[in-house]
Amino acid sequence: MKEKYIVGTAKTSIDNAITKNYNSFFVGFIIDENGRILDVEASAILKITNDFIKKIFIGKDFIKDFDEISSIILKNYLGSSQKSIIVAYKDAIKKYNQSAN
């Protein structure tokens, strides 16, 4: 199998529904052998949140498109987990880079 599954984690605010259900925010990525994001899912409460997150990430390069993806999140994702998505993404990149060594 040439694909990798990587999960990044982040904390969310105490009053966030995700924290009440999961204690943390998780984003799982399936990455192909060329670094393309094939699929992504987050520990979001609403289905529409995951649908929106998928539109942001799928088809992008996991490493090279970090700045573009982060910018899109900051401009267009106005939910309470905005920063948590970016932190979880950074955590997933760290794990991805460690697995390459």
Give residue ranges: language-model regions.
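Short, compositionally biased leader-like segments
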Residues: M1-T9
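Active-site- and interface-proximal helix/loop "cap" or "latch" segments in soluble metabolic
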Residues: K11-N101
